[in-house]
């Protein structure tokens, strides 16, 4: 264990933890990696995939100098990073989406992200939010420990060894894949699936699978993160039950299951009791999304890792998967019912219906309009005085919502789209493919899939800012499947919730606009 991580975990065991500012230096570089045995150029943090693991405690602030050292002319050289799941109260400019919250950061510059995790804790992640850049490798885990976790009695071990990332991997570079997608209308198909940055593809070398080490009798909190651009994963461990306890940074009532579906950008914590005979067991995360007929390299069942008991031989498992109970939305109930969502079966203050269509494939429309990024970030336009949709350019997919209001969003079913709301969690009061509203104790998340049935969620506008709502299949976002909420515009400019705007954030747009297109 690295010393810095050990100090974080020791602090997490002390009830009187003092909030600290923790600094993580990020060098963003192009390097050649072969996570599945096929070597290719990448865009990665500190030369590794997944990127550097961030571990902090509840109440901490983070300071992350991002040194953009990208040089490859075959991939995007500017960048922005989204810190997925954090509310960013008063720091909407640090949220990361290009042209919503900031201009991209040019190459050969340093920009420092600074924000507080405040009262949030749980499992988060970070990734590029410029075009489809994170599909080239810029993605990593971000964990916030709670020294007073009300479910702490359920597990013994919760450290860097129990963080599990699920990803797909492409042998083609993201800009080339995007161009092919736009010209053919066919979404790119991944070559392999990775667990903790390791995997295999059909006909490729037998690269070692990742190993999660356990000791018999201990209970492990596995923090499982889908850092994928497209597919979802069905996570299970052979011969072991799992106790679900967290979704997207929100702790829920414990539920015993055998497997969990985890969509792009979703996170779950599950407790694994190492109570089986000392041996090796397959950790499985087969992918849904991506047709092997379109890419012979792909074997969706090769998304594997090894659970290895202390004392077991260092060999691959021979265990067999036995299907069992899958976690259901109807079983997910937050342990706390206070904000940011406001529950109740009364009418919302504002109702919004988002109708998805694809009349001009591969591009998507919402209510007849495809999202196109503005040239000036939405947040900057709000801070410059925009108070109505007609004040923003382009204005078509900007939804202005007043402060302290209950917003209800209804999305009629149209394909499998994991929608992510920035700046908030939301309460899923009508789950996809369900016909019963739950206003008492619905799941609370920041990513939820629209799976062919009407989905309705509610959130409360207590956090002024510019907040993206978009499909987290990155190819779909690039094809226009998004809107932006401009929340409480006047409160962004002045008052106790006004935005903090550091000088280096204000400098981003002039710096970006001054560089040649090839460096953008």
Swiss-Prot record:
Q: Where in the cell is it found?
A: Secreted
Q: Which GO biological-process labels does this protein carry? A: lignin catabolic process
Residues recorded as binding Cu cation 1, renumbered to this chain, are 82, 420
The entry marks the following residues as binding Cu cation 4, namely 417, 471, 476
Which residues does the record give as Cu cation 2 binding sites? 84, 127, 472
Q: What is its EC number?
A: 1.10.3.2
Q: Which EC main class describes this enzyme? A: oxidoreductase
Q: Which SUPFAM superfamilies match?
A: Cupredoxins
**Quick one: which residues bind Cu cation 3?**
129, 422, 470
Q: Span of the secretion signal?
A: 1-19
Q: How is the cofactor bound?
A: Binds 4 Cu cations per monomer.
Would you say which domain of life the source belongs to?
Eukaryota
Family (UniProt): Belongs to the multicopper oxidase family.
Q: What is this protein called?
A: Laccase-1
- What is the source species? Agaricus bisporus (White button mushroom)
